[in-house]
Regions:
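Short beta-strand-loop
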Residues: 72-105, 125-130, 179-196, 218-221
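C-terminal "exit" segments of structured domains
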Residues: 207-268
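VWA/integrin I-like adhesion module and closely mimicked acidic/polar interface patches used
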Residues: 112-115, 137-138, 145-201, 219
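Aromatic-capped interface at the extracytoplasmic side
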Residues: 12-27, 262-267
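Short, small-residue-biased leader/transition segments that mark boundaries at the very start
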Residues: 2-8
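Short, charged loop segments at secondary-structure junctions
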Residues: 36, 42-45, 84-118, 198-201
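Soluble periplasmic/extracytoplasmic beta-strand elements of cell-envelope proteins
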Residues: 31-41, 75-80, 99-101, 138-142, ...
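…and closely analogous acidic/polar surface helices at protein-protein or active-site interfaces
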Residues: 22-29, 42-75, 92-99
Length: 268
């Protein structure tokens, strides 16, 4: 027992231990409100996907749902607008819900026709202003027309958003030539100077999406400009085992000593 006790003592002196590293990832996500044009002109079929003509709304759904999927750490919300504005989804990390809402979009969801860009910016900014502790807040405005409705002008709404620290990225969708829809040539009344000014006032950027390639490129560019901040921390946990060996060794040594003491003396 004493010999075995010495073995355990030597093991204790070697300081056996178990080392485990745990990595923790902390992400400071961005709050993103997407202002989605649902006016009737979004049904203009002047975009092409997989060699098939599609309308602007279908193109927007395709590109935006992909963008949502690419931002797992960001809270995303949706406002839709035509002649009026409607909030469809508050800021959420439930991106399956966001994309489900987007896929159900159609122009007749908002009965008032027109393009209320200022009201859409104001509604989106109100949602973002509720999030006081978020480091980065942005609005992505997707539209195919000039503002012709609403209670507030686009530039005033943009100035108010800028005061709240909100950046606005504007995307003009569609071709100036338009295309045939229901036997009629449909053209868009783009107001790109205003869209550029909205972006400029808030520190954002303006993009023009005349086809699927440029539409995708716009959202890719926004994704590169607006990155979530991730911090990775590694914590090392060390569990010492020497005490187990030391106690066991001491116990065995004591047992060996006790056995020697209790061992009967040899017969004379």
């Amino acid at each position: 027992s004493r010999g075995l006790g010495d073995v355990y003592k030597r093991q204790a002196l070697a300081r056996p231990q178990h080392v485990e590293d745990k990595t923790f990832r902390t992400v400071n996500g961005i709050d993103i409100m997407i202002a989605f044009d649902l006016s009737y002109s979004m049904e203009t079929p002047d975009m092409v996907l997989n060699r098939m003509p599609i309308n602007r709304l279908v193109a927007a759904k395709h590109v935006i749902t992909q963008f949502v999927d690419s931002r797992p750490d960001d809270r995303i919300g949706i406002v839709g607008f035509a002649g009026k504005t409607k909030s469809f989804c508050p800021l959420t990390l439930d991106h399956a819900l966001v994309n489900s809402i987007i896929r159900d979009f159609h122009p007749r969801m908002i009965q008032a026709d027109g393009t209320a860009i200022g009201s859409a910016i104001a509604a989106a900014a109100t949602r973002l202003d509720d999030r006081k502790n978020t480091k980065s807040k942005i609005i992505i405005l997707v539209t195919d027309g000039a503002s012709n409705s609403g209670q507030i002008s686009p530039l005033v709404a943009a100035e108010n958003a800028a005061k709240l620290g909100i950046k606005i990225y504007t995307i003009a969708v569609g071709t100036e030539e338009g295309t045939l829809a229901n036997g009629m040539v449909v053209q868009s009344e783009f107001d790109e100077p205003t869209l550029r000014k909205i972006a400029q006032l808030t520190g954002g950027e303006h993009f023009r999406a005349t086809n699927m390639a440029s539409f995708n490129k716009a959202f890719t560019s926004i994704g590169k400009l607006e990155k979530s901040e991730a911090k990775v921390q590694t914590v090392r946990h060390i569990e010492e085992y020497f005490m187990y060996f030391l106690v066991t060794g001491a116990a065995l040594a004591l047992l060996g000593l006790s056995l020697q003491v209790l061992k009967p003396a040899p017969a004379p």
